[in-house]
Structure formats: C-alpha cells, structure tokens
Amino acid sequence: MSGLLKLLMMITVGCRTSTAHRRDPSGAAFRAAWARCLGLCILLPCPAIAATPVRIVAAENFYGDVARQIGGADVTVRSILSNPNQDPHLFEVSPSVGRNVSGARIVIESGADYDPWMAKLLEAAHGAERQTIVVAALVGKHPGDNPHIWYDPSTMLVLAKTLAADLAADDPAHKSAYERRLGRFEASIQPIEARIAALRGKFTGMPVTATEPVFGYMFRALGMQVRNMAFQMAVMNNTEPGASDVAAFENDLRTQKVRLLVYNSQATDPIAMRMQQIARQSHVPVIGATETEPPSQTYQAWMMSELNALDHALAE
C-alpha cells in the first residue's frame, strides 16, 4: 500500500473519531469535519499518471528502428519482418501479427508492392483508428519501381520527419522530445552521406552488377553504372530471366566488364548462385547485401557496414 493511501486512511479514521463521541442531530459538525478532511486531501500531492506510449507497428525492422529512434520511451514498436536469415518474399502472415496491427496507433509499410500482405492486415483491422505511413508514397515510388527504397538514406530522412510530425499530432505533450530526437537522427545520417560522397569520388562511372536490385539505390547514390537490370528484375519478381539476359550477365562476368557483383544474401536461387560462382572464377569481387536490418544494429551502422564492405571489396 502506498504512503499516500495510508495517510488518507488515517485522515478518514481521524475525521470519523472526532465526531463519534458527540451527539449532533443536524449532522452539521460531521459535515464540517469531512469538509476539512477533504480539503487536506486536495492539498496533498498526487502521483502523476504516466501517459500511455504510442503503439507503432512497422512492416520491416529498419522502419521500426527509425520509429524507435524518433519515439524513444514515448512509443512501443513492433517490427513484423526482423529476421535477416528469412527470405522476405516468402513471409506468411500469422494471427498474432494481425492482432498487433489492429492495436497500433501508427502503422508503417514500405509499399511499391514490397509488402503487399500489409494491405490485407489493414483491411482486416478496418475498425481501428490509426495513421498509416506508406514510405514509397512519401518518396514518389510506385509498383513496378525498385522497391528497396531504404537503401537510399534520404528516404529514411523523409520517414523520420513524417514520424516526428505524426507523433507530435497524436501525442502533443511530447512534441519537443520528438523534435529533439529528429534532430539527432538527422545528424546521425550525415556521416553516411559523407561516406557516400567520398566513395562516389572514387567509383563514379564504375560498371557493376547484381543478382537482384537490392543495392540499386545505393549504387545510384555512388554514381556507379549498373548493368543487367532485366536479369535483376526478373529474379526479384520470381520469374525466369530470359536466355539472352543470362548470357549477357555471364559474359559481363567472364570478360570482367563489371568490377563488382552484389547478391541478395537473404534470397538465393540456383541461377543467382551460378552467377556468384562465375564471378569468383573470373576474379570479380562478390559481396552480399541483406534486405533486413541485422539484429543489434541501427540503420546507420548497417548502411555504414555495407558501404565499408563495398569499399573493401573494390580495394582488393
């Protein structure tokens, strides 16, 4: 029992005792005593009632990470896709995931057909009041575009600003805290931008290739010339690349027309593995890129790690 509650009980007992030994047919003395007791209760300090954190559900953990960095202790975040050893394209929705979405105040999805299962979850939870952020829509991307938009750090800056504004609207008591954390997030992206600028000075125009367009937006930021896009899009869409596209890819590797091969380390198939083998036989550097943020890393550390791996591979 709290000290405040004990004190209130003592006051109440005292008030009753002070009037019990006297006869007061009108009850005036009793009412006056209670008024004095209530006055004391009003003057006593009361413990503050903690605000309920804003519940956020993110389809992917890199968006959940940004939400956590902006929201801090004022939010709770659940990320649906968070296992870097799982192929995101094979994800299946479970009832527990649906329950989490239905209770969220803010939902973040990637859009551009990367996580189409989110639309079904939101439709099933149609009665709830929530704010839905579609990141692809924030940056002008649509179905048919490369959906791996988080590999462009500017995308995450746009998301962070949107989150800070939405959280401030939903929870105005902590508006200044959200704005302060947004400022820290923006500052933390600057080293990534500086690293990209430095690497762009070294690698602009360099021909590179990939088994899927996971790293595509980062390639573009680095000024690299990306080849074999028809092959990459076919693999991403789980369709068989055309024979001419396969032949062109193999030729680029065997003749070293490309300086680097990036593969999706979360989604491998026989033809992608074959390209890796040919690249290694042809002494073309090979690095893996993940679609999902690795555990115990922030988005910032993850992107810096990917950039360092690219720089190291090309320096060999």
Language model features: what each stretch is:
Residues S18, L38-L40, N146:
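Residue-level detector of alpha-helical transmembrane segments in integral membrane proteins
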Residues A35-P47:
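Bacterial N-terminal signal peptides
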Residues A50-E316:
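Extracytoplasmic metal-acquisition and chelation regions
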Residues M1-A32:
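N-terminal secretory signal peptides that target proteins for export/translocation
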Residues G27, P47-I49:
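Intrinsically disordered, low-complexity segments enriched in proline/serine/threonine
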